[in-house]
């Protein structure tokens, strides 16, 4: 469970590093929501798995959410085969093999997202007929994921329905939301990047932030990542 929780917190910090504006734990979260906000977001779907993920990614884009750091909720180290992903499935796989490790998203994928999000102002400022040239500025892994024609059509639609950079960004991230990010991360690790052990990836993210972490023990990483999140 230590390794899996580190994976969740590494993913959270990877999103924060990329500059994604709606960073929130969408797997293993304990959350509460007001009834009116629940209704406005369309409610929770009836999928048998991932319903928290789908609901939260709709909810957080409206803003007004916050994290409670005055208490702690620990994921349960309980194996489960109810669904093929998530805490229960991961614990089951890790428990089945002695000395096994968990492979997580390559930190370079989050760096690609950071470059991509850093181009948003240029996407807004350019003319529609310049979008094809701007597509070539997008990092290679993301270009493999995005269909150029569909990307140009989507950006043109967003530009035609926004008057300023604030509304442009809001529409952009309503499209390239957490669901799209997960799809990209899963795709890019099939065709371009290789996953790495969660300890290596956690270390690389810290190094990118100028933090040299001596220990390679998962628990030490986890305690540090918990503190990072709590302290903002």
Q: What annotation goes with each model-predicted range?
A:
Residues 1:
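Conserved donor NDP-sugar-binding/catalytic core segment of glycosyltransferases
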Residues 9-32:
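A recurrent flexible, glycine/aromatic-enriched loop bordering the glycosyltransferase active site
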Residues 47-54:
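Acidic donor-binding loop at a coil-to-helix junction in glycosyltransferase catalytic cores
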Residues 78-99:
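PAPS-dependent sulfotransferase catalytic core
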């Amino acid at each position: 469970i230590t390794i899996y929780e580190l994976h969740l917190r590494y993913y959270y910090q990877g999103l924060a590093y990329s500059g994604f504006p709606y960073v929130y734990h969408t797997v293993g979260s304990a959350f509460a929501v007001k009834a009116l906000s629940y209704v406005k977001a369309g409610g929770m779907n009836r999928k048998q798995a991932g319903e928290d993920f789908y609901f939260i990614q709709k909810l957080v884009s409206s803003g007004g959410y916050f994290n409670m750091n005055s208490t702690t909720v620990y994921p349960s180290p309980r194996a489960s085969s109810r669904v093929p992903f998530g805490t229960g499935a991961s614990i089951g796989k890790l428990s089945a093999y002695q000395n096994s490790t968990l492979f997580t998203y390559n930190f370079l994928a989050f760096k690609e997202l950071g470059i991509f999000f850093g181009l948003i102002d240029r996407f807004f400022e350019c003319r529609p007929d310049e979008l094809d040239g701007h597509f070539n500025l997008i990092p290679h892994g993301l270009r493999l994921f995005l269909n150029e024609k569909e990307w140009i059509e989507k950006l043109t639609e967003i530009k035609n329905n926004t008057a300023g950079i604030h509304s442009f960004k809001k529409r952009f991230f309503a499209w390239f939301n957490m669901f799209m990010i997960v799809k990209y991360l899963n795709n890019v690790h099939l065709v371009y990047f290789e996953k790495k052990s969660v300890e290596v990836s956690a270390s690389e993210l810290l190094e990118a932030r100028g933090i040299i972490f001596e220990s390679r023990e998962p628990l030490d990483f986890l305690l540090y990542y918990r503190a990072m999140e709590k302290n903002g």
